[in-house]
A protein has these predicted regions:
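Conserved helix/coil segment N-terminal to the catalytic DExD/H
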Residues: 74-86, 91-111, 132
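A conserved SF2-helicase RecA2
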Residues: 383-389, 395-466
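Conserved pre-motif I regulatory segment
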Residues: 1-17
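Conserved P-loop NTPase motor "coupling/switch" region that bridges the ATPase
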Residues: 41, 60, 114, 131-224, ...
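Conserved helicase ATPase core of P-loop NTP-dependent helicases/translocases
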Residues: 310-312, 320-321, 327-364
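Interdomain linker/hinge connecting the two RecA-like lobes of the SF2 helicase core
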Residues: 12-15, 126-127, 173-177, 183-303, ...
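Conserved Walker A/P-loop ATP-binding site and its immediately adjacent core
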Residues: 27, 39-60, 153-157, 314-316
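SF2 helicase motor core recognition
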Residues: 96-97, 153-155, 317-323, 342-343, ...
Length: 466
């Protein structure tokens, strides 16, 4: 990573094409340090589902504030106005379309010194709004593109990244195609009429090597299995989401008493269950309000439409509610799923017949091989830890080829709540009893910090009946 950062920082415009899980984010942030731009405005353009992750990494690695351009139009403009160091914006918010102006102009007006384009393959179509927005950053002095797949489909898909980095050298798409690829004229007959079109799937003689040599001059292209063979089969990404206004209200009321709105809890365990449900989706228990976790999942599915994904939850009711909002193919596996149907779901998922597999943690802890998935999302976790570990192991590779796939486990949590604390306790392999006792202590400390005197029992050990 240090060697890559030094190389990438040595030229004004560069690209990190290293495979997933080789540390492109810290490498990019190290480039900022090496260029001595820590005190300058840095623009980071990424997918909407990654903006908070970038903020956390930026502030951790550089020790400087990083604004997030998200939420309402007012909040986005406020973030741009407060921008002093880092600013993270989604490509969807940044780009201009026929129906909205986007944030290109107000962001560029702040004159950032460097732009990092994450998931740069998303601009592969040079005529798309994504690409046109990226091209407008051409006057930013330092530009860095990040992607593990610079040419996802065809070799010429790399053109837009080249234009983003070197607009004066790669200004014309068709000049690029004519230079490097053999153009073939084709005709098909439709309704008795010919339709002519061109294809250019093959390189001209020696042009593949020439284009590769150009890429080598400004990019790193490392393979995970070559440079990091010690990596574990799976890696974790914690996504901390801000609670909605309604969630803050409900959680605060539960911390102060045993009720919120019309929900009355009857003890510590019941209160903790309701607390977890509110963090997941307030509507699960008949309360108003949005679910930041659901919104994040739906955005992630839009950002990565080609991924096969497993989504785990302890609450079947949430998985059912989530399924009603999915705009892609899915299947639901819970405790009541018949054995025969369960087997068919597994077979179909492995064959790529649907994209999202919704699974109750307790129902999916055994007898499942789902290595077609690259990503698993946990919307919530709760003991026993053994069930969670079994669920995480559903995509252990069944073939040598699949052993080299990146297996990512995303943990969704509501920031600065006990929902976040549960994940920390599970990392220490705490039991259900330990977590409930910690919840009692958490409530006690929260009430104390809020200046409330204790009027309800908030301490004491909980022992689960055996």
């Amino acid at each position: 990573q240090r060697d890559d950062a030094k190389f990438l920082a040595s030229i004004p415009c560069s690209a990190c094409f290293n495979e997933q899980r080789t540390g492109k984010t810290p490498t990019a942030l190290e480039v900022i340090k090496l260029r001595r731009l820590q005190e300058e405005r840095i623009l980071i353009i990424t997918t909407a589902s990654s903006i908070y992750q970038w903020k956390e990494e930026y502030e951790t690695w550089l020790g400087k504030p990083c604004e997030v351009c998200a939420g309402t139009p007012t909040n986005k403009m406020k973030a741009i106005g407060s921008w002093t160091h880092g600013l993270v914006v989604s490509l969807d918010s940044f780009k201009e379309t026929e129906s909205r102006s986007g944030l290109v102009q107000p962001i560029l007006a702040r004159e950032p010194k460097m732009v990092i384009l994450d998931e740069a393959h998303k601009i592969k179509n040079p005529k798309s709004a994504n690409a046109k927005a990226a091209f407008k950053t051409k006057n930013i002095p330092f530009r860095l593109a990040l992607t593990g797949t610079p040419a996802q489909g065809k070799p010429y898909d790399v053109f837009s990244i080249l234009k983003f980095l070197f607009p004066s050298d790669f200004g014309s798409y068709w000049r690029f195609i004519d230079e490097y690829f053999e153009i073939q004229d084709n005709v098909v007959w439709q309704g008795g009429r010919p339709r002519h079109f061109k294809t250019y799937d093959n390189f001209r003689p020696d042009k593949a090597a020439q284009l590769q040599e150009i890429l080598n001059q400004f990019s790193t292209q490392r393979k995970r299995k070559d440079v990091m063979p010690w990596l574990p089969d799976k890696f974790y990404q914690k996504v901390k989401l801000n609670p909605s206004r309604d969630q803050k209200k409900y959680l605060r009321e539960l911390e102060e008493t045993y009720r919120t709105e019309d929900i009355i809890t009857t003890g510590t365990l019941d209160r903790l269950v309701r607390y977890r449900q509110i963090c997941l989706d307030p509507t699960l228990i008949g309360l108003d309000g949005k679910s930041p976790k659901t919104e994040w999942i739906l955005q992630y599915l839009k950002d990565y439409p080609d991924e096969q994904i497993i989504i785990f939850s302890k609450f079947t009711s949430y998985l059912i509610k989530l399924s009603e909002q999915l705009e892609t193919s899915w299947a639901l596996l819970v405790g009541s799923t018949p054995t025969k149907q369960r087997g068919q779901f597994i077979k179909d998922f492995q064959a790529g017949k649907f994209k999202v597999f919704l699974i109750n943690i307790d129902a999916g802890k055994e007898a499942l091989t789902l290595d077609a998935a690259e990503t698993t999302i946990f919307t919530d976790k709760f003991p026993p830890i053994g069930s969670i570990e079994q669920a995480e192991d559903r995509f252990i590779a069944s073939t040598e080829e699949k052993a080299h796939k990146a297996h990512k486990i995303i943990e969704l949590m509501i920031a600065d709540t006990f929902d976040e604390q549960i994940y920390k306790l599970l990392e220490k392999r705490k039991s259900e009893t330990d977590i409930i006792n910690n919840y009692n202590q958490y409530i006690k400390e929260r009430r104390k910090s809020n200046g409330h005197k204790s009027t309800v029992p908030v301490s004491g050990s909980y022992q689960r009946a055996v």
